[in-house]
Regions:
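Conserved catalytic core of the tyrosine transesterase superfamily
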Residues: 1-181
Length: 181
């Protein structure tokens, strides 16, 4: 005998699929890493609902995204999965983005989104970043053989990364707007 699927569960599942497969990659223009984090965060929330709250995919509803459940999820992430406050905030942010999309697609989910927005972020202590000394930077920049083409390329790339503080992935994804290639 087939289980009766809650119509709201089907609607949420459809919106979730559309959000992950269409909205996030194209409209929101997120990186594959961000998309992967969003997917992991939602999977963890669904796992929490299944394991702790006894909610199955067939019984999913708007009530599953209430403020109380989300706050319990954050505690579950910390206690059962060993997540740091920073990781909990990333997971919470991903869930909020989905719920915002959900409320955009169907106004009846607006209260769910607003409840999620009111869940406080976890407090995390800022780690002091210890930079490299001038001598260490000089040693690093002197490593590539600037006499060769590849060495000069590497030196230029290292210098650009250092002077702009851009991440290598960000630099590699830059596109030339005027390029006709």
């Amino acid at each position: 005998m087939k289980k009766k699927i809650n119509p709201q569960a089907m609607q949420i599942a459809d919106y979730l699929h559309d959000w992950l497969e269409h909205y996030v990659p194209s409209i929101k223009a997120c990186s594959p890493h961000t998309k992967r984090n969003y997917k992991i965060s939602v999977k963890l929330y669904v796992e929490f609902l299944r394991v702790i709250k006894g909610t199955t995919p067939e019984t999913l509803s708007a009530e599953c995204f209430c403020m109380e459940y989300i706050m319990e999820w954050i505690i579950w992430l910390k206690e059962n999965r060993g997540c740091s406050p920073a990781t909990c905030n990333v997971r919470l942010s991903a869930l909020r983005v989905f719920l915002k999309y959900l409320s955009f697609r169907d106004i009846s989910y607006m209260s769910v989104f607003l409840q999620a927005e009111n869940v406080p972020n976890e407090k995390n202590s800022k780690r002091k970043v210890i930079g490299l000394s001038k001598q260490a930077v000089d040693v690093l920049l002197s490593m590539p053989n600037q006499g060769s083409t590849i060495g000069f390329r590497d030196y230029t790339l290292m210098l650009l990364l250092y002077s702009t503080a851009v991440r290598i992935n960000e630099l590699l994804t830059l596109k030339d707007r005027k390029s006709t290639r």
